Curated annotation (Swiss-Prot):
It comes from Mus musculus. Its main location: secreted. It holds the Pfam family Kunitz_BPTI. This is Tissue factor pathway inhibitor. Residues 1-28 form the signal peptide. Isoform alpha is expressed in heart and spleen; isoform beta in heart and lung.
Length: 306
């Protein structure tokens, strides 16, 4: 009996001790919450998922993405692995701001007349080191226009835009946008390889013009076929083929095994099948002499009238 009373007394003593500690525990939680609120600031994001931490996921890709940082109240860049993760992940900085920052108003960044473009607009096309296939846009300083290119999925440079509209707003000057030019098609010419003749002026006479120099816009195929041969970054030596848009042929080169670009084929046949179809090519092998069509001969018969 005495043992049972002692056990009961110990139980109630423990309960009383725990109850006495509850107020202190609640005060500690309140102080911690106050510290967290002061650290995060008074701004609340528009959506609860904006408060999640950046999650790159379990995969190993390197995709530039953006997340909202609750501590800095800003959208920041991070590298996404390519799978899983959470909803606090955006493809563009502007999308992140519009989704998570209260009161953010979209401001169209336009290059005013005479205004300087950002330095990264003048960077060369850089598809990066990965072998993905992502449609992106870059500003071409030679044509003064935004053009489509294929991004590999990692690294590269800042002259890389998700949409054509975004590229134009940041890098393209609307005042100096070139007016459409009537491009001369190869079908308007006949050639023997050295002499180019205007088809419209041919009338039993071949009028020589200056030779037509191959230009980049004469190619209408896959964009990676215009990339130069890139042997990559590793130390292997594998026989590969790349398409030369200037000659219209596939040439052999040594590939080191990693990196490089998409203008990389295991066989010459695959190279030609993938890239040759985009070349605007003149199929005639000699000077075509065009004669004016003569009127049909009509025989007139005169009969005497008696």
């Amino acid at each position: 009996m005495t043992y049972k009373m002692k056990k009961e007394y110990a139980f109630w003593a423990t309960v009383c001790l725990l109850l006495s500690l509850v107020p202190e525990f609640l005060n500690a939680l309140s102080e911690e919450a106050d510290d967290t609120d002061s650290e995060l600031g008074s701004m609340k994001p528009l959506h609860t998922f904006c408060a999640m931490k950046a999650d790159d996921g379990p995969c190993k890709a390197m995709i530039r993405s953006y997340f909202f940082n609750m501590y800095t109240h800003q959208c920041e860049e991070f590298i996404y692995g390519g799978c899983e993760g959470n909803e606090n992940r955006f493809d563009t900085l502007e999308e992140c701001k519009k989704t998570c920052i209260p009161g953010y108003e979209k401001t169209a960044v336009k290059a005013a007349s005479g205004a300087e473009r950002p330095d990264f607009c003048f960077l060369e096309e850089d598809p990066g080191l990965c072998r993905g296939y992502m449609k992106r846009y870059l500003y071409n300083n030679q044509t003064k226009q935004c053009e489509r290119f294929v991004y590999g999925g990692c690294l590269g440079n800042r002259n890389n835009f998700e949409t054509l509209d975004e590229c134009k707003k940041i890098c393209e000057n609307p005042v100096h946008s070139p007016s459409p030019v009537n491009e001369v098609q190869m079908s308007d010419y006949v050639t023997d390889g050295n002499t180019v003749t205007d088809r419209s002026t041919v009338n039993n006479i071949v009028v020589p013009q200056s030779p037509k120099v191959p230009r980049r816009r004469d190619y209408r195929g896959r964009p990676w076929c215009l990339q130069p041969a890139d042997s990559g970054l590793c130390k292997a030596s594998e026989r590969r083929f790349y398409y030369n848009s200037a000659t219209g042929k596939c040439h052999r080169f040594n590939y080191t095994g990693c990196g490089g670009n998409n203008n990389n084929f295991t066989t010459r046949r695959r190279c030609l099948r993938s890239c040759k179809t985009g070349l605007i090519k003149n199929k005639s092998k000699g000077v075509v002499k065009i004669q004016r069509r003569k009127a049909p001969f009509v025989k007139v018969v005169y009969e005497s009238i008696n």
